[in-house]
């Protein structure tokens, strides 16, 4: 039974500026003698137009765009492939969408005119499998059971050795009661230890002395710490011995609290001045309150 050829013409909206393109497409040899349906491609893109599968023999896309500048929705290529019958052709799209065409089941045909042709679906014939033949016991492979490995020879222990086979001298050494006696730790100390002792050389006196180890237990660390503390004590004693001491006239010169004295030793700053001259002995210190005792020990290091 033969069916009438059906063709679909999809029109780009810009084709209205060049109507001769639509006229030339309808006169194409692939559309001769076919029932032509024409729709705007926008309706197919927005879903308002639904195409039935295997309904068209030819689909023609008309657009004023150049072949390498055509902008066509790629998802519609699969829709057009489903709407074509096996062996049907699609005209108007070019190599820019060649990969999409191959993935959608088209073959690229370049002669006599460029178009895509839908591949025919090859029917797969079922293959009849031969029934599986029962396998007899005689046909099964035979395997030889490996012999169990012989146990390894076990060396008898001293308790299992007969008394006649034991050397009496060795037995006396092994069974000696002295072997179980505790050993004094002093007996384990080597008389001449080959480990050298770390000695430090003083840069001033050129004398050498031992350095205490990290986990010292012989008292050398305590001895070193005591020597260091004694050295610090002597240094502090020497420093304190050179502390500045003021005589009575010197204290009177700088002391603001002396009764009847209103200015300091500089002769210009009074007791309560917050800003002092460059020669004032209390330059940089806050103003003193009247009657407040002045302690000079806090600034003895600076003086």
UniProtKB/Swiss-Prot annotation:
Intervals of motif Cx2C motif 1: 266-269
Keyword terms: 2Fe-2S, 4Fe-4S, Cytoplasm, Iron, Iron-sulfur, Metal-binding, Mitochondrion
GO molecular function: 2 iron, 2 sulfur cluster binding; 4 iron, 4 sulfur cluster binding; electron transfer activity; metal ion binding
Motif (Cx2C motif 2): 277-280
Domain of life: Eukaryota
Keyword Oxidoreductase tagged: no
Claim: Iron is one of the keywords in the record: yes
Biological processes annotated in GO: cellular response to oxidative stress; iron-sulfur cluster assembly; negative regulation of hydrogen peroxide-mediated programmed cell death; negative regulation of nitric oxide biosynthetic process
Main location, first listed in the record: cytoplasm
Region (N-terminal SAM-like domain): 1-125
InterPro entries registered for this protein in UniProt: Anamorsin, CIAPIN1, Dre2_N
Protein name in the entry: Fe-S cluster assembly protein DRE2
Annotated source species: Eremothecium gossypii (strain ATCC 10895 / CBS 109.51 / FGSC 9923 / NRRL Y-1056) (Yeast)
Record gene name: DRE2
């Amino acid at each position: 039974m033969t069916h009438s050829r059906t063709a679909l013409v999809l029109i780009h909206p810009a084709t209205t500026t060049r109507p001769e393109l639509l006229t030339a497409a309808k006169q194409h040899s692939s559309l001769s003698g076919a029932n032509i349906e024409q729709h705007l491609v926008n309706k197919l893109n927005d879903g308002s137009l639904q195409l039935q599968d295997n309904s068209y023999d030819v689909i023609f896309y008309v657009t004023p765009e150049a072949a390498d500048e055509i902008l066509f929705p790629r998802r519609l290529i699969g829709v057009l492939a489903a709407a074509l019958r096996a062996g049907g052709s699609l005209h108007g799209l070019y190599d820019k969408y060649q990969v999409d065409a191959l993935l959608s089941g088209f073959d690229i045909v370049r002669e006599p005119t460029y178009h895509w042709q839908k591949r025919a679906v090859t029917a797969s014939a079922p293959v009849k499998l031969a029934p599986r033949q029962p396998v007899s016991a005689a046909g099964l492979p035979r395997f030889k059971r490996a012999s169990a490995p012989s146990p390894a020879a076990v060396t008898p222990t001293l308790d299992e050795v007969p008394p006649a086979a034991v050397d009496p001298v060795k037995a006396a050494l092994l069974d000696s009661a002295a072997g179980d006696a505790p050993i004094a730790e002093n007996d384990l100390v080597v008389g001449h230890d080959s480990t050298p002792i770390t000695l430090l050389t003083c840069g001033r006196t050129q004398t050498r002395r031992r350095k205490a180890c990290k986990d010292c237990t012989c008292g050398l660390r305590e001895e070193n710490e005591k020597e260091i503390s004694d050295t610090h004590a002597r240094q502090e004693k020497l420093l304190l011995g050179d502390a500045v001491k003021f005589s009575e006239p010197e204290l009177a010169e700088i002391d603001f609290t002396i009764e009847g004295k209103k200015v300091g030793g500089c002769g210009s700053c009074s007791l309560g001045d917050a800003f002092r001259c460059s020669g004032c002995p209390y330059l940089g210190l806050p103003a003193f309150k009247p009657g407040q005792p002045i302690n000079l020990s806090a600034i003895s290091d600076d003086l």
